[in-house]
Design a protein with these regions (language model features):
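C-terminal motif of bacterial Sec signal peptides marking the signal peptidase cleavage site
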Residues: 2-4
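Bacterial signal peptide processing site
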Residues: 6-9
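The canonical Cys-X-X-Cys-His
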Residues: 37-48, 127-138
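A short, amphipathic beta-strand motif
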Residues: 56-62, 96
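Short, ordered, surface-exposed loop/turn motifs in non-cytosolic proteins
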Residues: 65-84
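Short, acidic Ser/Thr/Gly-rich low-complexity loop/linker segments typical of extracellular
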Residues: 84-95
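Short Pro-Gly-centered beta-turn/loop motif in secreted/extracellular proteins
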Residues: 99-109
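A short, solvent-exposed loop/turn motif at the edges and junctions
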Residues: 110-126
Length: 150
């Protein structure tokens, strides 16, 4: 389920006033597990007709506000529990991205675990396109980005 880095990934160092982590993706749609943090992976892959067929995908950020392409947080665990009780665990990569192609029974619940703390999503979901609500501009009642627990 998790990622492997490939050669040719491009990131740039930016001021922390621009991106909290000080890193930003700078390679456009160059195929990589680190690409386009914060953007809607599932919608893009369907629209472009290429890339893995993710069932759940998103990015974990240090806080609720972050611009698209800013790197998120590496090493957080995203736990998706399907309606059947099966847990699917994903660890965020260097860009904060997580994803899976496994079938997940909906509605599912979600939580983020990091350094002994958890943040729980309160409402069960049927879409795995996390950034469709947790985007640069939050929608559908989301408070903002998927953020680390406080």
């Amino acid at each position: 389920v998790l990622v492997a880095c490939s050669e040719g990934e491009q990131e740039v160092v930016v001021p922390t006033s621009e991106c909290a982590t000080g890193l930003k993706w700078d390679a456009g749609d160059e195929g990589s597990p680190l690409m386009n943090p914060g953007e809607d992976c599932i919608a893009c892959h369907k629209r472009e007709g290429e890339g893995p067929d993710f069932t759940v995908a998103g990015t974990v950020f240090p806080g609720l506000m972050a611009a698209d392409d800013c790197y998120g947080v590496e090493g957080a665990t995203v736990i998706i529990t399907g309606a059947d009780g099966v847990e699917h665990r994903m660890t965020t990569n260097k860009a904060g991205n997580f994803f899976t192609e496994k079938t997940i029974k909906t509605p599912y619940t979600a939580r983020v675990s990091y350094q002994g703390k958890e943040r729980v999503m309160l409402t069960p979901q049927t879409s795995g396109a996390c950034a469709s609500c947790h985007g640069q501009t939050a929608s559908a009642g989301a408070p903002g980005r998927i953020a680390l627990p406080e």
